[in-house]
A protein has these predicted regions:
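Flexible, acidic/Gly-rich N-terminal and inter-domain linker regions that tether
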Residues: 2-179
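Post-transit mature-domain signature of plant chloroplast proteins, especially small thylakoid membrane
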Residues: 70, 78, 173, 203, ...
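Short, solvent-exposed polar/charged micro-motifs at secondary-structure junctions
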Residues: 120-129, 151, 277-278, 343-345, ...
Length: 447
């Protein structure tokens, strides 16, 4: 399905606006990472596709440099795809026969294909099964949101996984529509979260930057005129364990000549790899960050997320990396918290979570607030402490657990609506922490 032509955004997503991402440098980092990761992922055994992905801008730019193809030629080809809504670059005007022959022989828009699509009953969400060139499968989810012009949101629901963005929405019948696409970064996952089916697979392969971007391309085609407003890397895999490929994919998504999304419209979700969170702050500070926290204490978190049990991944180290990211990005991370009945949904858990997020925020702002060692504590009015917290940029997403086969082996069950509402109320009213329940997850069971 062709996507209607749109004017370039005013986001200034120039390809030279990223820190440390000049062509040859990022290409060298990528090749080094691939060699280092081969023993753990089996990527050495993945056969190359017959043609490379044209959505992998590092591959395209490197090929162009090596073969004397000018950057403007690439811009013309990408314009054919993203501005004129064509499904191929092969008929781009004003490109020499020699250059087009080289590009056609070596690249295709997509190396993957959608082999299954399941849609929710109300049509506002969908899950695509994407088959990679070597037969491996990943999942990509599209979540639709609508709101009235006065801001009341429906379908997606409050707290739906979306990045902050001020890009253009589609308006119809007094409502504003937007789509968020949730993409995978790996086949399988090494994190082993006890409630997640993907973790039972282990890590099978890292996706290339092109394969990550192709999921967004498939989603654009599925969404048609409404297009894709936001991208969240919350699908299969741990994005920060496939760092260089994810970084190149982020660059393509926000590249003015390619997907042209605002950097703040793209969010990377992580279970918490402190060293890589710092790297992301250095390399792409304007991209959103979401932390899959899921527990307010180290002991409980290590039980739910085995990857959090090491000394390098403690809550203390994680807090320091979050503060570093906030200093460079100017905004706090979104805190993802899957709520499981009887495991992490009590008022005590909610208050521990409020204290944890509160301490993190205070430590980040302590130079601005003298004479206080606790949020809303002695010497500070409750209202004043709440206002500072609300301005911090941190946001807690309370996500109802969706039953899975692996979760059932641990006796995990979905929480009651009352428990979710109580947790949100405690965080908001007692701690001044912004918190919402992602009710759309209930709807996500359909797909």
């Amino acid at each position: 399905m062709a996507v209607s032509e749109a004017a370039p955004s005013s986001s200034s997503n120039d390809d030279f606006s990223w820190r440390l991402l000049e062509g040859a440098n990022i290409h060298a980092r990528r090749e080094h990472a691939r060699v280092a990761l081969w023993p753990s992922t089996g990527d050495r055994a993945r056969p190359p596709p017959p043609k490379r992905s044209f959505l992998d801008i590092d591959e395209v730019e490197t090929f162009a440099r090596d073969h004397g193809i000018k950057k403007n030629t690439l811009r013309l080809c990408y314009r054919e795809l993203f501005r004129r809504g064509q499904s191929t670059f092969e008929h781009t005007p004003d490109v020499s026969a020699r250059d087009m022959k080289l590009l056609k022989e070596n690249f295709t828009v997509c190396t993957s294909e959608v082999v299954e699509t399941k849609t929710t009953e109300d049509g506002s969400g969908a899950k695509m099964v994407v088959k990679l060139h070597d037969g491996k499968l990943v999942e990509t989810v599209v979540i639709g949101h609508s709101r009235s012009k006065d801001g009341d949101e429906s379908n997606g629901g409050a707290g739906a996984p979306r990045a902050a963005s001020d890009g253009g929405d589609v308006e119809k019948d007094g409502k504003v529509f937007r789509n968020t696409v949730c993409v995978s970064s790996q086949v399988g996952c090494a994190m082993g979260c006890t409630f997640c089916e993907t973790g039972t697979l282990g890590l099978l392969a890292n996706l290339t930057a092109g394969e990550i971007c192709e999921q967004v391309w498939h989603a654009r085609n599925l969404c048609g005129k409404t297009g894709v407003r936001n991208v969240v890397m919350m699908g299969m895999g741990e994005p920060l364990d496939n760092y260089e490929e994810v970084l190149i994919a982020l660059r393509a998504m926000t590249h003015q000549a390619v997907f042209d999304m605002r950097q703040r419209s793209v969010t990377v979700s992580t279970v918490g790899v402190p060293s890589s969170i710092r790297k992301l702050a250095d390399d792409a500070p304007n991209v959103g960050l979401a932390l899959s926290l899921h527990a307010p204490t180290q002991e409980l978190r290590a039980r739910l997320l085995p990857s959090a049990s090491g000394t390098a991944h403690t809550l203390g180290r994680l807090s320091e990396s979050l503060k570093y990211h906030r200093r460079l990005s100017g905004r706090g991370a979104m805190i993802e918290y899957i709520v499981i009945d009887g495991v992490n949904d009590s008022p005590t858990h909610a208050r521990d979570l409020g204290e944890l997020v509160g301490r993190t925020l205070l430590q980040d702002d302590e130079s601005e607030v003298a004479g206080s060692n606790s949020l809303g504590g002695e010497g500070e009015g409750k209202g004043k402490g709440r206002r500072r917290r609300e301005q911090s940029g941190y946001f807690v997403n309370l996500i109802p657990y969706n039953p899975t086969d692996v979760g059932s082996t641990h006796g995990y069950e979905s929480p009651a609506d009352e428990a979710l509402e109580r947790m949100a109320a405690i965080l908001t009213e007692e701690y001044g922490v912004k918190a919402k329940v992602r009710w759309s997850t209930r709807r996500g069971r359909e797909v």
